[in-house]
Amino acid sequence: RDTDRSRGLGDVYKRQGLYWKYESWLKKMDYQLYSAIGAAGELFAIRTPLYEEMPEDTLLDDFMLSLRIAMKQYTIAYCDTAYALESGSADMKEEEKRKVRIAAGGLQSVYRLKELLNPLRYGILSFQYVSHRVLRWSVTPVALFLLFPLNILLVVCSESLPVYFLFLLLQSAFYLGGVYGSLLSAKSVKNKFLYIPYYFLFMNINVIKGFFYLKRHAGGTWEKSRRA
C-alpha cells in the first residue's frame, strides 16, 4: 500500500507512511507467528465460499470479516508484495476524522468479537488479537493518561526513590514534545523528532474520541475524509 506523492501531501503523507510501515511490520510478525490480525480493505482477497455478510451498521467490515474467517481456523496471510495506491488525508483534521472512525470501529469490533477474547478456545489467535488490537483500542489510551497523575503521586509519596522522579521527567518531556509537535504541525513546520510523541498522542486521543463517536452514531455510515 502506498499513498499518492504527486499531490503534495507533505507532513500528513509522512505520518501516514511511517505509521503504515510500522503496521505492516506488525502484520508480518503476526503472520509469521500464526496469522495476521485484520486486513486492509483495498488489499484483501478471500475465497468466495468464506465470505459472509456483516451487520449493516458495521464500521470496519474488512477487519470483522477477516477475523471471523480466522476464527474458523483459516490463516490470514500477509503478502508484502501486494500493492495498492491511494491518496492520503488532505490534512490532519481529515486524518483525525479517519482515526476517530477507525477507533470507533475497533471498539465496536471488540464488543462483537468478544468470543475471540477466550484464549482457551482460540489460543495464539486470541493472544495476537488482544495484544495487537484490543489493548490498543481499550486499555492503552486510558492507561496513557492515568500514568501522569499516578506518577506524580509516586513522586510525592516516595521521596526516597528518585527513579520515579526520573520517569516523571521523561514522561513530561514526551507529552510536552507531543504538544510542541502539534503546534509546529499547525504551522506546517517539520520536525521528525517531535513527530513520534505528537502522532502517538494524536492517535490515542482519537481512540477516546472514537468511544464517544460510537455512542452517538448507531449506523455504519460515516463522513468520508477528504483526500489530498
Where are these regions (language model features)?
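Short coil/turn segments at secondary-structure boundaries
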Residues: 37-40, 112-113, 118, 145
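Conserved nucleotide-sugar donor-binding
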Residues: 40-53
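Alpha-helical bilayer-embedded segments of polytopic membrane proteins, i.e.
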Residues: 125-184, 195-206
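Single conserved hydrophobic/aromatic residue that forms the stacking wall/gate
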Residues: 2-13
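Catalytic donor/gating beta->alpha subdomain of glycosyltransferases that bind UDP-sugars
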Residues: 1, 15-23, 57-61, 66-132, ...
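A residue-level structural signature of the nucleotidyltransferase/glycosyltransferase Rossmann-like core
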Residues: 36, 42-43, 75-76
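Juxtamembrane C-terminal module of membrane proteins
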Residues: 93-94, 115-125, 172-228
